[in-house]
Amino acid sequence: IVKGAVDAVCAEKKIKVFLVGKEEQVKAELSKYTYPQEQVEVVNATEVIAMAEPPVAAIRGKKDSSIVKGLYMVREGKCDAFVSAGSTGAVLAGGQVIVGRSKGVERPPLAPLIPTEKGASLLIDCGANVDAKPSQLVQFAKMGSIYMENVMGIKNPKVGIVNIGAEEEKGNALVKETFPMLKACSDINFIGSIEARDIPAGAADVVVCEAFVGNVVLKLYEGVGSTLI
């Protein structure tokens, strides 16, 4: 994280990075690098949220943790974004409790970029909502499309929903109900169902699924990658 922050401020002169954590440890790591010091500020946080801790209880109980302090900085307008390598559950819970959701957003998804033959695709959702509703999958599709177009620079990104076949009538109840809703969306480039084998081929720029399926896809990617490498 510290190296990433240093690389960021060295590459972009207009940004400022706040490193939130145990001050002595962070400064010791920073001392290894040369960087524009006016663009980096260390914010001391004395507590740590462990990976195994219940997220909501940890957010409420550890006010001086880096996750809680960082999220409050976003809420108070001191920062525009928050990045963490800590507990995913705590970041999600804290994001909703402290920062809040954007207007109209039902649930926040987890959306990593995954490698394909044609570049990166966005897998959304991969772990936040294992029992998602059709309306939420539609929102994920729209959010993913906006991200891929505006952040990744892909014009009119292709959106596909993960299914057990390419035919519209296939799938479980969730996919069957979501499919026509996605098809009716005029603001996304919905290409229909995609099978798991289509994902590494880059068939879709935005791969939509509920978190149970998405997490299986993500962990399979990780396992295959480590096996082959």
Enumerate the predicted regions with their spans.
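N-terminal glycine-rich anion-binding loop in soluble enzyme alpha/beta folds
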Residues: I1-M51
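Solvent-exposed alpha-helices and their adjacent loops that cap or buttress functional pockets
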Residues: C10-E12, T34-Y35, I59-K63, M73-G77, ...
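A glycine- and small-aliphatic-rich helix-loop capping segment at beta-alpha/alpha-beta transitions
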Residues: G4-C10, A90, G94-A111, E177-L182, ...
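Phosphate/nucleotide-donor binding subsite
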Residues: Y35-C79
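Short beta-strand segments
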Residues: L19-G21, V43, S84-G86, L113-I114, ...
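Short, acidic/small-residue loops that bind anionic groups at enzyme active sites
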Residues: A93-G127, A184-I194
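Glycine-rich phosphate-binding loop
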Residues: M73-L92, K170, V175-L182, D187-I229
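Glycine-rich phosphate/diphosphate-binding loop of Rossmann-like nucleotide-binding domains
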Residues: K16-F18, E23-K27, V130-A196, D205, ...
